[in-house]
Amino acid sequence: MLGFIIRPPHQLLSLLSCPGLRIPRFSVLCAPPRLRTMAASSSFSELPLVAVCQVTSTPDKEQNFKTCAELIREAARLGACLAFLPEAFDFIARDPEETRRLSEPLSGNLLEEYTQLARECGLWLSLGGFHERGQDWEQTQKIYNCHVIMNNMGSVVATYRKTHLCDVEIPGQGPMRESNSTIPGPSLESPISTPAGKIGLAICYDMRFPELSLALVQAGAEILTYPSAFGSVTGPAHWEVLLRARAIETQCYVVAAAQCGRHHEKRASYGHSMVVDPWGTVVARCSEGPGLCLARIDLNYLQQLRKQLPVFQHRRPDLYGNLGHPLS
């Protein structure tokens, strides 16, 4: 099914720019019918195309990889230069003990499979939240929630370990203690250059801390990515609001690949993966099931908007300090 959102013609993002392409199952793509002619223009079709994948991870790592690989191959077939996977793309366990048992180091078999997949497809990958056994695994028996960027040759070019852990008690959603099995990362990662633009790395709960996004944009980020696994209570209330807020305040594209559906008897996720442009408009989104959506990234539009609305020139650190001080 197509979902239509009326939005400025210079930022229309959809598959309609690629005549003859088959729309993937479960995708929802944003394009008002009256702008289809414009969407097929050569200048629009030359913009970088990104794919945002939505999955329902379970404790079955092999099946999870098969699902993700199918979506990545579809993204490559459709002409994307970069595919985004959600937090916990590798698995979602039933308890901390199962999390520890299923986790791997970055040098393990699973990332080697993704290395081969990136080479096969010629695609950059944002692997949004890998359960990593770090160098301190033997001492701590805890993992890092690690966001991995892999280039189209299969090389890991950036890693970010989630710095804000989700230890919360939400009525109707149940308690969550990420710190039971996870260590917070020690630092932020400088934005990484990709074919789609300079990407600032974050994960899920990080989006609730605007200082992080401000630090990333002041360090040069053009795209902020929040791979996530939002729950069924916080999702409807906060998901889109937070993503649009981060896009507006930083004047960045925001890409948010999400987990969806029921993972096992103890957990379900909200879904609704999306891309938000620097104006704050949702330009692509997935429906509730597994699938992908596509968006084009227009960095000229981003720069134009930053010139027209120069909020970073108007900041007053003399009054409130430099929130989100640039990364060193």
From Swiss-Prot:
The active site is at 87 (proton acceptor), 162 (proton donor), 204 (nucleophile). Belongs to the carbon-nitrogen hydrolase superfamily. NIT1/NIT2 family. Its EC number is 3.5.1.128. Its main location: cytoplasm. It is found in: Cytoplasm; Mitochondrion. GO terms for cellular component: mitochondrion. The keyword Hydrolase applies. The keyword Ribonucleoprotein does not apply. This is Deaminated glutathione amidase. Residues 1-37 form a transit peptide. It catalyses: N-(4-oxoglutaryl)-L-cysteinylglycine + H2O = L-cysteinylglycine + 2-oxoglutarate. The lineage of its organism: Eukaryota, Metazoa, Chordata, Craniata, Vertebrata. Residues 47-299 form the CN hydrolase domain. One of its GO terms (molecular function) is deaminated glutathione amidase activity. Keywords: Cytoplasm, Hydrolase, Mitochondrion, Transit peptide. It comes from Bos taurus.
